[in-house]
Amino acid sequence: MDKIVKSSKSYKKYIMPSGIIRNVQGYEPFALDILLKTYQEEQIKTDRYDLPVINYTYNDKTKRYFPDIWIPHINLIIEVKSQWIYNKQLEINKSKEKYTKDCGYEYEVWIFDRKANKIVPYLV
């Protein structure tokens, strides 16, 4: 397992319907609960090694973005955030979105409150 994942205290264990355990962060479990109502778990990628890496520029520096969730068969990347974190890092999030779309991916930001309510549509 990835050294970062092992040492990080911010990761949570999420048990998929098959019993496979995935390491997720923040509000990602809320998104997975929703996605598993529509997609098979094999169609939902969350492991860093299964995700595309998007290079983006912010403040004249090239950075690497590892998406939260990727659904390859529909080419959709989903970024999962709390409203507070999304707004706090607004310019970075917009840069990630732009470069992800420029790479040809569909892109959605899913914002949740603490009670697992998805805020739709989310307006800044």
Predicted segment positions?
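Nucleic-acid endo/exonuclease domains
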Residues: 1-124
